[in-house]
Structures are given as C-alpha cells and as structure tokens.
Amino acid sequence: LLLVNQLMDLRKNQSGNLQLRVSHNDLYLFTQEIYISFNQIAVKERITFRLESDESGIDAWFDRVLLEKVFFNLLSNAFKHTAPDESITIRLQLFSVAGLQEQFPGRISGEVRGTSRYVCLSVEDTGKGIDDSDKFHIFSPFYQGTDESESNTAGTGIGLSLVLSIVKLHKGVVWVEDNKPKGAVFRVLIPVNREA
C-alpha cells in the first residue's frame, strides 16, 4: 500500500496535481509526534534515537500530510542503513537567510531568498553513509544506490524523489552530505512564514 501511495504521489507531482495545503502549526510538536512514532523501532533495533531542537516551539506554515511523508522517507532510509548500537538524530534549527548563507556557504545560493526565516530539518545517522557517486542521482525517480542492488532491503527509488518534490512545493531545498566521522545527513530547508 505504501508503494502504491508513493507512486500515486509521484504521478500527481509529475502531472502538476500534487497540491500543497498549508496550515499554521508548531513544527517542534509535529516533529516530536513523528519522533515518538519511530522511537519503538529504535528501541527494537537498539539504535540511539534523539530529537534536538534550538527551540521548543516553532511556529510555521506547512502541509502536515506532505511533510510527514518527507520525515517518513528520510527516517525509514536512516533506520534501514543504521546498524544496532549506532545513532540517528533529528535536528531542528531556525535561521535567517543571512544565517543560512553563513552556516551552509555555497549550498543555497539563489535558492533561498527574501526576509523569511527558515527551519533546517536534519536527519543525521552514523550508518554506512552514501557513496559520492550516488549523491548526484539520489533524488532522481527510481534511482537506487550502488549498494541497494546487493541488499535485501532495497527500496523502490521513489521515496527521495518524492521528498525533493514535496520540499520544492514548500519553496525549500534538500540535499545530502557526509556525517563525520561516518554516516549521512539529509538537510531540508523550508521557510516558516506563510508569505514565502
């Protein structure tokens, strides 16, 4: 059923019919609900799982249903590629545009503008990481990483493409980078103001 829903969402996006329905919410509480729902998996898999935030209340305009799909895909991938006794962290940080340019130089030039504040949603893991050759294609529809074909947990290659589409609908940016000393970090920037 999940695969069918993701295919339908991908198809809607390709045809221009994936609609954004934003409402005013507390992004921290929303993220905390998602954290709680994944915590059982972390306990079962013996993975250290944390939620860290600059602020305990983050007023933002976003589509709850679609942003939940972003979190679900990013966290599902993190859990799939993180072994027992490793860790996964969800991190929320608020930035001005100037703060973003200082924190992530060269990452967001031209894609983030205006006076809006942005929230950076990061999913960080200490798993096996992502090959450099895969980083350029990882958000393409149906792309599977080089190690996926040899894995018994191979995905469909739809999830990260859907993440990119949803983030763009929110007028945001998403990318992946290495987590030091090992693992991967997916960062999602979305504006918190309705006007954005």
Language model: regions and residue ranges:
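Helix-loop junction within the histidine kinase core
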Residues: 11-22
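ATPase catalytic-site recognition across NTP-hydrolyzing enzymes
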Residues: 136-140
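Short alpha-helical Gxxx[C/S/T] motif in the catalytic ATP-binding
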Residues: 154, 159, 163
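Coiled-coil phosphoacceptor/dimerization helix of two-component systems
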Residues: 1-10, 30
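Short helix-loop "hinge" at the ATP-lid/N-box region of the Bergerat-fold HATPase_c
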Residues: 78-79
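Conserved catalytic submotifs in the C-terminal HATPase_c
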Residues: 21-26, 43, 48-58, 95
